[in-house]
Amino acid sequence: SLKGDANLRYGPTTDANIIYRYQHKGYPMEILRETDGWRYVKDPQDGVEGWMRSFLFSGKRYAITKSEPFSYGYDNTKKNQILVKLDPGVHTSIKNCDSKWCRLKMTLEDEELDFWVEKKNLFGVYSNEIIN
């Protein structure tokens, strides 16, 4: 995920034209390949690809809710009680993921929320990815 503001470029050099300017700390990007301090990445929401400097990425994992009408955040233990209804495009921190669900964390109106969302409703994590 991005540490902060970042430019997506057509080539792996600061002289290359800028495709898009990201201004979202924690925005998840899919890393397709790396070379000499640069990463060729794909935006998981719209599929745009380009180059970014490697130092612009943090080791923290974030997700974005997909453009379904909304996603549900479920209770931590039973995954059957709805705790929160999430609009499309909500950024959340990933705590961990099992084979089908991701445990997410976010703050809403000064309240810390901890809940589960099905992977199929998230950008920023692969369907077969396990995160501990």
Which role fits each region the language model picked out?
Residues 1-9:
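Short N-terminal segments immediately surrounding and downstream of signal-peptide cleavage
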Residues 13-14, 21, 28-34, 42-81, ...:
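Boundary regions of SH3-family modules and the immediately adjacent low-complexity/disordered segments
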